[in-house]
Amino acid sequence: MSNSKEIPSFRWTQSLRRGLSEFTTPVKTDVLRDAKMILDGLDFNQVSLVQRILRKSKRNDGDLDKLRDLNKEVDNLMSMKSSQRDTILKLGDLNKSELMDLASDLEKLKRKVGQTERSASGGVYLGNLSQSQLTKRSDLLRKLGFQQQQVRSPGVVRIWDVADPNRLNNQFGSVPALTIACMTKQSDNTMGDVVQALTSLGLLYTVKFPNLIDLEKLTAEHDCLQIVTKDESGLNISGYNYSLSAAVKAGATLLDGGNMLETIRITPDNFSQIIKTTLSIKKKEGMFVDEKPGNRNPYENLLYKICLSGEGWPYIGSRSQIKGRSWENTTVDLSTKPQQGPRTPEKAGQNIRLSHLTELQESVVREAMGKIDPTLTTWIDIEGTSNDPVELALYQPDTGNYILCYRKPHDEKGFKNGSRHSHGMLLKDLESAQPGLLSYVIGLLPQNMVLTTQGSDDIRRLVDTHGRKDLKIVDIKLASEQARKFEEPIWSDFGHLCKKHNGVIVPKKKKDKDIPQSSEPHCALLDCLMFQSAIAGQPPQTKLEGLLPDALLFTLEAAFTI
């Protein structure tokens, strides 16, 4: 597509909002909580100092140190932040066409950003030569017939004369909580006044891009908006400046609806699905990366932000502690690896969310799955629904080997209902479940393997979702009372293996009150043991051995919420 084509920026923005609406979340409470923390905890003398630094025409390493130190203080005060999580997208996360499309756009974006940053310097030297060396260099170039490029730049050209330009990365994006706190403090208004004013800008943003004329009209109603600068926002100066774009972004976070892109939250579980959805919207709307230097269009802006970090709030969270750029932190691996069974991505619209394991983790899982003998009876059971499983168990009674893994649910409402009446698992215990592990295990099941289960419908749907239609499912179809005949001895002997079922079970009301109802939670592994015991007429006699190490089941950084 020609880069000269006019870009319908707001139409693209609206299309992205609609298409990515399922990933947006209400953030007003979180933003205001962080704003209050910043307002109460930040030294605003240092804020004023940094704002003066940002107004200087030339800034050095000492100035950058002050900016970075203040950014770190802000980051420490905030709960909404992006984490350093480098991501390698592979076949299975996206299809080959999508991976190639993403790789191409990231490369174009890299060139565009590089050219924009170079042109923004206005031809002014950004390195660390001394002034005398620069003068001598200019004289030498003039003698050799090179004419100095005449650069037209609106206003003052502000540059960073620093030894390591990489230290500038991720230090300048506006953060709504910081914008609200600074406006409250420095405009001498209440936070309530600031919130009302920014909300008006946010509401306007749902139908158009607010401009300076709109700002002037709104300022007549909201005095605190006088602090918003009328100057065009420049590159690498917006962190603590009251630009219109920073105010609009803050306003977007204060709305209860609107599917604002600013409220997207990325997790390791939904990252690949967000990328997939974005590429689909791009194709439908004819979006593209325009490599000409200049401001990013809505698609470019979204792509840059979501690829910078695989976890957090890409638009509005603190990201000053992230190292690297988008094309460095999100990379594409087009190589294919032989697998024990076919592993294909989920179908559009389904809730299975594939994520990524490290090379070492994949190696450990492959080694464990290599001990599953496809010629032996293999029980399989899950907790949760087929399109949103939270626990998977495989059990081979002949050897005692078992696989047990977990997954954070996508449908929290459905999960809580299942927790209350069935499995008793708690959301807080699954927050740090290793992303992608459950799906990877299913993908590694040997080709054409036979799996034994009590009730086959959900298992059939689960393996089909993962592209494993080759797997054979045998349903033993025991009566409910017969299937749970050994429930008490199984829980007595093996309950210590069931560590994530700590909720209280409330039995559902049934028409037949003569049938006793169990108050024990359903555990995928223990259910497999019960079903096998019902067939064998006795509890397992072979010592059980878990094939996956506990350290692999959950990530090291446990989830923490306030």
UniProtKB/Swiss-Prot annotation:
This is Nucleoprotein. GO terms for biological process: negative stranded viral RNA replication; RNA-templated viral transcription; symbiont-mediated suppression of host cytoplasmic pattern recognition receptor signaling pathway via inhibition of IKBKE activity. It is found in: Virion; Host cytoplasm. The lineage of its organism: Viruses, Riboviria, Orthornavirae, Negarnaviricota, Polyploviricotina. Belongs to the arenaviridae nucleocapsid protein family. It comes from Sabia mammarenavirus (isolate Human/Brasil/SPH114202/1990) (SABV). HAMAP family: ARENA_NCAP. Keywords: Capsid protein, Helical capsid protein, Host cytoplasm, Host-virus interaction, Hydrolase, Inhibition of host IKBKE by virus, Inhibition of host innate immune response by virus, Inhibition of host RLR pathway by virus, Interferon antiviral system evasion, Manganese, Metal-binding, Ribonucleoprotein, RNA-binding, Viral immunoevasion, Viral nucleoprotein, Virion, Zinc. Encapsidates the genome, protecting it from nucleases. The encapsidated genomic RNA is termed the nucleocapsid (NC). Serves as template for viral transcription and replication. The increased presence of protein N in host cell does not seem to trigger the switch from transcription to replication as observed in other negative strain RNA viruses.
